[in-house]
């Protein structure tokens, strides 16, 4: 589930102090005085990788990689097989912390607030994580049951599933088994799975 985070740390109950940041899913607010002031994140987050270095057994996989991505934009990283694209993706999503370097989301460190930001990052892997024997809609409903907060009822989950099916032009394939979809349709279903929770950042390997 998304959980509630105070200054990047998951909490159940905590007394707030002036200036604290509290996040629930993609919603973030700042505690000022006796009130919570919502922070405007509808414009998306800026994203920057700074001097990312990854080495294994003295073999350099990533060497001083830096780049920035503007909010609400699309960036493609291309290269031949073995160039380090998946290694970079693992580093900039926090799946593997690099030897050195930093990733900033807005003005905050991904690695210092990993538990919080992991709920706001969608990652579509090379290999689909879908249950091939399930129908498309059922596979997404199952994914929603695992990813949504426990207090989300069945009707709310079903509504969100229908929304992403429509957004990705999969409504007519809702009752078709995953293993009967075309390759492109399966990949769109994998994207739909990640979009269920409306992540602020979406990565595709």
What residues fall within each predicted segment?
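Q-loop/switch helix immediately C-terminal to the Walker
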Residues: 132-149
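Conserved structural motif at the start of ABC-family nucleotide-binding domains
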Residues: 47, 62-64, 118
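C-terminal boundary/linker segments immediately following FHA domains
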Residues: 5-57
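Conserved ABC ATPase "signature" region
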Residues: 141, 145, 156-173
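ABC ATPase C-loop
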Residues: 194-195
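The feature captures the beta-strand-to-loop junction immediately N-terminal to the Walker
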Residues: 78-81
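Helix-to-loop junction immediately C-terminal to a conserved catalytic motif
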Residues: 93
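Conserved ABC transporter NBD signature motif
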Residues: 101-109, 117
């Amino acid at each position: 589930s998304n959980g509630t985070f105070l200054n990047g740390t998951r909490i159940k109950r905590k007394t707030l102090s002036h200036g604290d940041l509290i996040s629930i899913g993609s919603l973030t607010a700042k505690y000022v005085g006796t009130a919570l002031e919502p922070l405007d994140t509808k414009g998306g987050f800026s994203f920057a990788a700074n001097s990312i270095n990854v080495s294994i057994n003295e073999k350099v996989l990533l060497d001083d990689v830096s780049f920035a991505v503007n909010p609400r934009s699309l960036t493609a990283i291309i290269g031949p097989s073995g160039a380090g694209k998946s290694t970079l993706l693992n580093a900039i999503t926090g799946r593997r912390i690099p030897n050195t370097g930093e990733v900033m989301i807005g003005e905050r460190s991904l690695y210092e607030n990993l538990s919080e930001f992991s709920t706001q990052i969608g990652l579509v892997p090379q290999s689909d994580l879908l249950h091939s024997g399930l129908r498309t809609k059922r596979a997404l409903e199952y994914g929603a049951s695992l990813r949504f907060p426990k207090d989300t009822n069945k009707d709310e989950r079903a509504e969100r599933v229908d929304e992403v099916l429509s957004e990705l032009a999969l409504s007519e394939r809702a009752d078709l088994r995953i293993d009967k979809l075309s390759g492109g349709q399966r990949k769109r279903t994998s994207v739909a799975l990640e979009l269920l929770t409306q992540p602020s950042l979406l990565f595709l390997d």
